[in-house]
Amino acid sequence: MLDPYENLANAIVLQAVKDYRDALKRLKKKPSNQAAMSDAMECERFFRSGWYKALTSVDGEYLIQKLREEAKSL
């Protein structure tokens, strides 16, 4: 069973994934959307941060790549 801190860490990472997916979808619809670009860049900074590395063992660059591939296929 996961402890509450692991649950919180997982929830933080999952929310960032949802936010990144949303930003990529908005960029696909309208590439000039500055708010979506800003949101995507903020998520990428998080995925490359030390805080992200403290929350999960999933490689941030790998996650970014997979989410971009997913967005292209939609």
State each model region's role.
Residues 34-72:
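Short, charge-rich amphipathic interface segments used for partner binding and complex assembly
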Residues 1-34:
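N-terminal acidic leader/helix
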